[in-house]
Amino acid sequence: MNLTIEPGDFVSVIGNNGAGKSTLLNTIAGTLTPDAGELMVAGHRVTKRSVAYRSRWVSRVFQDPKMGTAGELSVAQNLTLAEKHTGSLSLRRYRRADQAKRYATLLASLNMGLEHRLTTQVKYLSGGQRQALSLLMATLSQPQLLLLDEHTAALDPQTSKEVMALTEAIVTKQHLTTMMITHKLSDALTYGNRLVMVQDGQIKLDVRGEAKARLQASDLMGLFSD
């Protein structure tokens, strides 16, 4: 498989179960090591590098809201952990008034009331609130590549729409290069400038711009059945 993601691309990746979507994402993230070939992120060869090493440039939001946050810690403490890449921060630093105010401002942008729950343990948040927090944490450092691993699949339809709208707003505002794995054809068609279909470990379709905008769900369903 040869795939180049250009800076600023928002790529939706679709495919049947077992097509290779998760393998592709896990290889980029570093949880799987390819048998051959080379992988570069932001100009750095990372083929054999660890997840921790790649985290300098790559952030990931998982399908399970619990995986991107620490449930026993407060909302503010989770945000402090997410800022570890920007410098050495104490978990107690959030108690400072200026830190709390900044966090409240960030959380208010999510429109989920989390700005009023800085000291609440994350395990008491709803799935949508927790996933929104995960998304905020993953993008605090403005990563070179944001990986979204079916990040709305565990949410109810309304919350899924809210998190997707939030995703688009953050990606657009920060001009983030993004790869989103999704089973929802409507999301794949609605969001992003590029759509990639994976089948049997190969790229079956790769469209962008106006060509993507012209696609209909029926077109994609036809490709799935081929």
Regions found by a protein language model. Name each.
Residues 37-45, 205-207:
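Conserved ABC transporter NBD signature motif
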Residues 29:
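Helix-to-loop junction immediately C-terminal to a conserved catalytic motif
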